[in-house]
């Protein structure tokens, strides 16, 4: 018999990501001034203290009420999808846990300070990517995993239709 929900694994992932996110942001916020930067991997990775009161790339800057409302809706929707659509599917449950943790990590920043602490500053193939944080990484990985799960599910359905 397969487990319907992997609650322990899902909670562990979400708690770990949120704690790691908040601890790294706290270290950056308390040890670096905004704009301070140091090189970790030459021409690829810097740690740069930055604040963002919008979404990715500063979109919707200063719209905190919007972010509060939309984040609460997203967190509730993620719990709903976890319960309704991720049954017996550890892969999907991990993906949803990463999305939940990422959304919660940035939500905590917005509640406490009205802005998100960003610090991971990368230069990928000559493109100076916008500065981001652990929560953003968790969101991105969660989205990628959900896309993979959906593509895999679509592929499995096509295989079953052929048989």
Swiss-Prot record:
Topology in membrane: Multi-pass membrane protein
Membrane spanning residue stretches: 11-31, 63-83, 88-108, 131-151
UniProt GO molecular function: aspartic-type endopeptidase activity
Residues at the active site: 118, 136
Cellular localization per UniProt: Cell membrane
UniProt-listed GO biological process terms: proteolysis
One Pfam family it belongs to: Peptidase_A8
InterPro entries: Peptidase_A8
CC per GO annotation: plasma membrane
Pathway the protein acts in: Protein modification; lipoprotein biosynthesis (signal peptide cleavage)
EC number assigned by the record: 3.4.23.36
Reaction it catalyzes: Release of signal peptides from bacterial membrane prolipoproteins. Hydrolyzes -Xaa-Yaa-Zaa-|-(S,diacylglyceryl)Cys-, in which Xaa is hydrophobic (preferably Leu), and Yaa (Ala or Ser) and Zaa (Gly or Ala) have small, neutral side chains
Disulfide bonds: none
Origin: domain of life: Bacteria
Alphabetical list of PROSITE patterns matching this protein: SPASE_II (PS00855)
Keywords from the named record: Aspartyl protease, Cell membrane, Hydrolase, Membrane, Protease, Transmembrane, Transmembrane helix
Function of the protein: This protein specifically catalyzes the removal of signal peptides from prolipoproteins.
Record-stated family: Belongs to the peptidase A8 family.
Name by which UniProt lists this protein: Lipoprotein signal peptidase
Source organism per UniProt: Staphylococcus aureus
């Amino acid at each position: 018999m397969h487990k319907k929900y992997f609650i322990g694994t899902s909670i562990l992932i979400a708690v770990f990501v949120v704690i790691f996110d908040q601890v790294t942001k706290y270290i950056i916020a308390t040890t670096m001034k905004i704009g301070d930067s140091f090189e970790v991997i030459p021409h690829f990775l810097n740690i740069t203290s930055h604040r963002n009161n919008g979404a990715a790339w500063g979109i919707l800057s200063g719209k905190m009420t919007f972010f509060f409302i939309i984040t609460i809706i997203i967190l509730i929707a993620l719990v709903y999808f976890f319960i309704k659509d991720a049954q017996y599917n550890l892969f999907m449950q991990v993906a949803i846990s990463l999305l939940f943790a990422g959304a919660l990590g940035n939500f905590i920043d917005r509640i406490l300070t009205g802005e998100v602490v960003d610090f991971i500053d990368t230069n990928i193939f000559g493109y100076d990517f916008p500065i981001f944080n652990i929560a953003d990484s968790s969101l991105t990985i969660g989205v990628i995993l959900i896309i993979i799960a959906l593509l895999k599910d679509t592929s499995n359905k096509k295989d079953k239709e052929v048989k």
